[in-house]
Amino acid sequence: MITNQTERLNFASTKNIPAYPDFLDVQVKSFQDFFQLETKSDERGNEGLYNTFMENFPITDTRNNFVLEFIDYFVDPPRYTIQECIERGLTYSVPLKARLKLYCTDPEHEDFETIVQDVYLGTIPYMTPSGTFVINGAERVVVSQLHRSPGVFFGQSFHANGTKLYSARVIPFKGSWIEFATDINSVMYAYIDRKKKLPVTTLFRAIGFQSDKDILEIFDLAEEIKVSKSGLKKYIGRKLAARVLNTWHEDFVDEDTGEVVSIERNEIILDRDTILDKDNVEEIVESNVKSILLHKEDNNVVDYSIIHNTLQKDPTNSEKEAVEHIYRQLRNAEPPDEETARGIIDKLFFSDQRYNLGEVGRYRINKKLGLDTPMEKQVLTKEDIITIVKYLIELINAKADIDDIDHLSNRRVRTVGEQLSQQFGVGLARMARTIRERMNVRDNEVFTPIDLINAKTLSSVINSFFGTNQLSQFMDQTNPLAEITHKRRLSALGPGGLSRERAGFEVRDVHYTHYGRLCPIETPEGPNIGLISSLGVYAKVNGMGFIETPYRKVTNGVVDLTSVPKYLSAEEEEGMLIAQANIQMDENGKITADNVIARQEGDFPVIDPTAVHYTDVAPNQIASISASLIPFLEHDDANRALMGSNMMRQAVPLIRPEAPIVGTGLERQVASDSRVLINAEGAGVVEYVDADMITIKYDRTDAERAVSFESDEKTYKLIKFRKTNQGTSINLKPIVRKGDKVIKGQVLCEGYATQNGELALGRNLKVAFMPWKGYNFEDAIVISEKVVRDDIFTSIHVDDYSLEVRDTKLGNEELTNDIPNVSEEATKDLDENGMIRIGAEVKPGDILIGKITPKGESDPTPEEKLLRAIFGDKAGDVKDASLKASPSLHGVVLDKKLFARAVKDKRKRTQDKDALSDLEMEFEVKFVELKDKLVDKLFTIVNGKTSQGVMNDLGEEVLPKGKKYTQKMLYAVEDFAHLTRGQWVADDETNKMVNDLIHNYKIKLNDLQGALRREKFTITVGDELPAGILKLAKVYIAKKRKLKVGDKMAGRHGNKGIVARIVRHEDMPFLEDGTPVDIVLNPLGVPSRMNIGQIYETVLGWAGQNLGRKYATPIFDGASLDQINAITDEAGVPRFGHTHLYDGGTGERFHQAATVGVIYMLKLGHMVDDKMHARSIGPYSLITQQPLGGKAQFGGQRFGEMEVWALEAYGASSTLREILTVKSDDVIGRAKTYEAIVKGETMPEPGLPESFNVLMHELKGLGLDIRLEE
């Protein structure tokens, strides 16, 4: 029953649960696939960035004389580390370079040489290993978007009169939308870009089916009759299917050109649907028409009556008329000529330049319509249009079904990589435009690729995406769970998605295809409910952007437990019968139950085991990470589970975190996949440990050493008190000792809401569910003083305060501790740069960073100048611009940093010159050493072998085929980094070793070059700071927050409350053995909320604490009541936790037994210290002259309409008058009142409130003449 899994007793009954996929794959893998930096350039797939380049290149000028081709792209290492970017407020980015080839095809320019150049295209934000981007010093996440998949969708709507209207909409990846829809008169129209409508038959004519005959033949609706008098007589009484047209040509002379032009003319002899009679037959015979079309007499014609109706509405008779009609509809102008008119339809739907269905769109259309058009054909075809219309007609005749747009086969995920591809596409298209313009201008001069390219174009598009796009969000970094959840979030909002206002109930609702893909529980409360969701624990996004979830195959009632589970998309799952993961089966996987409850689409049939197609892989497959962390979730109401999973993300990391006694077994995976902790990279031994770093010596094979440039030892620096986005702190401490052996993946440290490698968001507390003197009424919480005293819920929060030193018109600002008109006491903790010392205690109003700024004033008189020169009075021309602590700030200075640009004077320039030459010499030695090391290692591998022809990336042979390797020959190679083609030796294994060695050499060389560039930059420029800023001073202040009355706490089951009273330890209710409880919760919070999971957790937690064990109870597969009872009996704990308590104040026993146990509580980010606020003298609004509102503005409390009524009701007229005048917006009155209070005089009469003047001005603005008269 219970298996021991990493020191937690696991209650899971399901066997063979597969390992979870990496929780950050959705971000990290998507970005890797986009950049493809790990892949060799000739092996890169046609996706991501490579594909975007291929779509935009080659670029030619208008005369096709010059061609700019794309060969490859690569990036240089970033200039700063991630942490340095955060401190300096910079973007963590890499310079993107492309290798471009420019050549000339014009024979006149034969002197123009082909040029291959590496061109800088701009810096591109780069993803950190934990799936975030650092933009302007803040960590951001690009959230994946859930949007309508490209393809064709069939839907229906109802007209006001009750008629059903049907439509088919083709949504491309890029290009115009086209929609086919019926109206109440049973006519089918095509709408292009939701604008102009035209009969479908007009579109048919425009794409090549020009006559009525061609159109009717598509649907097999007419029979053709040869015209002869005798032949037609037997068809009298039948209906005409197409017009009978008399066609002739007229010639006339074009006055402008003098050419003879022929024009086709049509005359309608008989219209459609005419019933033939004798007269008609004669007319037809006389008109010299060769054949006519009659309606067929079989049944399916009725289905297609819509086509006849549409032909009746069609104003055109030929292809030429049709394209001209379409041109007029779309452009609202006459077409200049037939060619232009024809081009418009081709451009809209049949040209790669303007229209693209994408691979997904083509796949969906083929799948829906049963076509087998090749995937490369990503524009619409005639066949597509015809098949769509045929399907729509089947739909009208109830022979087909409409699509469910909320089905996950019709919605796909746009991951980071795809969103970036789109932005790069926009940037490169703009760049291509400027390149073309520049090529056209430079006709005969010699120019290079660098001259054509403006690097700002691409950077500006990418930077605006990261800075302003709705899906690039400031990362929620309260704790590791919040980070990981934010990265796995899917949003239906954003550009190209829905908007909150327009989204109805259906889109927000849970759909049966969400099972295992999107979590039905975790979504925000409020206006975004259902629009923002979370990926299921096992879910993956496939290559086309559809979400897949794994299942085990079942054949004849036997579950395949050995193979890798099969991932199915929502579409592949349609119609399958899927059983639950915890059905009864023997060890071979044979299902032993007689009947099985299965899932089939939205239904739950009870079936025979042999009919089952698949089973789930795990019971928690349905939920997201947050929901899977709630033990006994199966006993909680879904609404409360939603609150529980959302509140776990707000839990503040505590000083001493503690993993829960009752967990679900997912805690370890969340901690390791959040990438916050340091994991061992292989097996090895701990060489050195202290609070700041861990050094490990790894065991490596000779083969690994042969291709590596790294030493066996690796040192990891631990993060100490780093500020997160939300102001909580990350502080890691080691959990290994010197001499310990470690294995791959082992966690080496803890901290930041983790303990011993497991997620630890809160603390286990002894709880009693009972009322306590009314203090826990309405979800309030009573807590013991011991909890506060022992720092159980104490957290450390870090704030950073920064001050910029700018260059002003009146002179430079300056950081200093010599501040005018400030006492020595106030500056005692400041250093010579005006920065407060580390370790100083800070109170509101203290100076954190001292700064003086030049002050503009009238020119001093000569006498003043003289006196100033003698007495050196500096105070006159500068003013205090220091940064002071805000009103509620109490803390300790944790760290300070000063960044400055390099100052340029003559002496400094000379020093820089020397420093640079020393630096280059130093690095030259390092480069030579690295190459020597490479040649030695390389020679060891290829010694005695002959070359198979090694080439560089331009295809030039560097090491000729058949030559025997010598050390001298290898030394002669100048550039190893570009030897990418050909074979080194005959056998593959050695080739792989050589390629790995050169790959590692490239990485090392890149790092060295990056380090050199960076050192040079530091010497020449100093610290990189935003424009106009000379220095940047930063001070980090740590605040220690103990638990207080007013703080919000919560359990994991949505049971939240506010601390109402902190009671002395001895006054808390105590158990029979004298142990006081830590926290008292109100039992009335449980029944109506229906989150009984907290009671199960409480009881099992107490038993676990007594036995010194921890448990894992996975959701939907957790401990049963019988199992819990067995454990409580073993632990000597009363069943259900029912026990009598004693009053701490009197020592008397309470009348009734209460539920007692151990519950896991979290302290949430809503702390009273951040919310408490009182205004003294503060700012006023400029127009209304009333005090501002809100803590951030140091504002007051609004005295609103209802409060005025209250004072009126009490007749408190003077109080009311003061509130509405001198305490608010009577400007003169408030100044006089202050004076009167200071001098101890009687209060003056109030004046006119400013809001009255505002009203007057508004009325005057309406043109009313308003005067105040005494």
UniProtKB/Swiss-Prot annotation:
Function (record text): DNA-dependent RNA polymerase catalyzes the transcription of DNA into RNA using the four ribonucleoside triphosphates as substrates.
Residue spans crossing the bilayer: none
Gene3D superfamilies, per database record: 2.40.50.100, 2.40.50.150, 3.90.1100.10, DNA-directed RNA polymerase, subunit 2, domain 6, RNA polymerase alpha subunit dimerisation domain, RNA polymerase Rpb2, domain 2
Record note on quaternary structure: The RNAP catalytic core consists of 2 alpha, 1 beta, 1 beta' and 1 omega subunit. When a sigma factor is associated with the core the holoenzyme is formed, which can initiate transcription.
Class of the enzyme per the UniProt entry, highest EC level: transferase
Protein name: DNA-directed RNA polymerase subunit beta
Alphabetical GO biological process terms: DNA-templated transcription
PANTHER family (alphabetical): DNA-DIRECTED RNA POLYMERASE I SUBUNIT 2
GO MF annotation: an example: ribonucleoside binding
Matching InterPro entries: DNA-dir_RNA_pol_bsu_external_1, DNA-dir_RNA_pol_su2, DNA-dir_RNAP_su2_dom, DNA-dir_RNAP_su2_hyb_sf, RNA_pol_bsu_bac, RNA_pol_bsu_CS, RNA_pol_bsu_protrusion, RNA_pol_Rpb2_2
Any one cellular-component term (Gene Ontology): DNA-directed RNA polymerase complex
SS bond partners: none
Reactions the enzyme catalyzes: RNA(n) + a ribonucleoside 5'-triphosphate = RNA(n+1) + diphosphate
Keywords, ordered alphabetically: DNA-directed RNA polymerase, Nucleotidyltransferase, Transcription, Transferase
UniProt EC number: 2.7.7.6
Family assignment from sequence similarity: Belongs to the RNA polymerase beta chain family.
Native source organism of the sequence: Flavobacterium psychrophilum (strain ATCC 49511 / DSM 21280 / CIP 103535 / JIP02/86)
